[in-house]
Amino acid sequence: MVLTDGAAIPAAPFFWYAAGFTFGRSGATVWAMPLPVIAHLDADAFFVSVEQACDPSLRGKKVAVGGRQRGIIASASYEARACGVYTPMATKLALQVCPDLILVSHTSGRYGQFSRRMFDLCGTLTPFVERSSIDEGYLDLSPCGCGTEAELVNRARGLQRRLWEELQIPVSLGLAANKLVAAIASKLLKPRGFVVVPPGTEAEFLAPLSVGVLPGIGKKSEAKLKAQGLTAVQDLLALNEEGWYALFGHSWRDIQAMARGEDDRPLKLEHDDAKSYSQQETFPHDVSDFAEIERIAKRMIDELMPKIRADGKKVRTMTVKVRYPGMEDSVAGRSLTEATDLEAPFYPLVELLLRRAWAKRRPLRLVSVRFSGVDDRPAQLEMFAQTEEKKRRLAAVLDKLNDRGRKAVVQHGHQLGKTTAD
């Protein structure tokens, strides 16, 4: 890999980037700037790494975790990726492109256990940890009390080494002033990468990188942009407002901010071992419009499900509660046959549960939605899993687009109607 300054990145696991310098070994230079205190941790080929930790004979081999027959590949080792295996890919096709691929069936419960142990170790470095998915998370390193970048780098690298020594899980780390840049940095030199972006150099760091590093720009969008000569992030920044709007519509300002490396999202510190997920809304005045209550309940589904996905969980049961004036509550619930982390299966239940819970049809003071029956087992990899995986990947893209502390960039149709006062 070569940046625009012509400096090649050496093939070693720990490197950092500083403005005015090429990639080099961390700790080699001191910069007189605030410290980059947000770290993004990204486990390398997590499912495969867990299986290799449990069976070291799999290390260094072309390995994939996936379902057999009509299943899909959930994770592939870097050796397998070099042969053309990717995620998600039909198992049948993966075995065609890589005949000597070692296929390992997923092990129920194992990945959640390793994930919890991984984030428990992160908690020994800092109490401020956000688990964004089963194999990724953010750390606020400001409580570490580091006075220099060398101390900060040593602490972070120490965590990286400890995760390998105690769990045999390789991870990549990105350090920056905000979550967006830290996440991009962590993926730049995988596997076992270590990249530091000093505060104030975010735009310079992103400028030569492919437009595809920005959240929300998938492979199809990236191909369309490159067909128009917009290859690197710096090409986007050269556009005027009309050009931005033509490409991205009303969300152009958010994507422009990302291209500049701007991100003010705080860490979300919810507990990741939740047994249920719930949200409620109390109205400033009593509400009797069924369609409005239904829209609010569906919006709660849309806001809760990204948290469930981020925790690597699925849920089976949805309960709707309504409250009449005078603190009188009424509830109704229904369970799916299979746990899920997608919104769509629960939408049809909203009207049914509301009609049951709201049998008296008096004006309401409050409505709440609660998900329970939490399941942290890995996704089913057989049968119709390819369709489910596509939906899950789309949901993950929407989560990243909307997780910017502003108004949602992408909304479902039921979110576009009448709104109530917050």
Q: Where are these predicted regions, by residue range?
A:
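Short, hydrophobic beta-strand segments
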Residues: 137-143, 331-334, 378-384
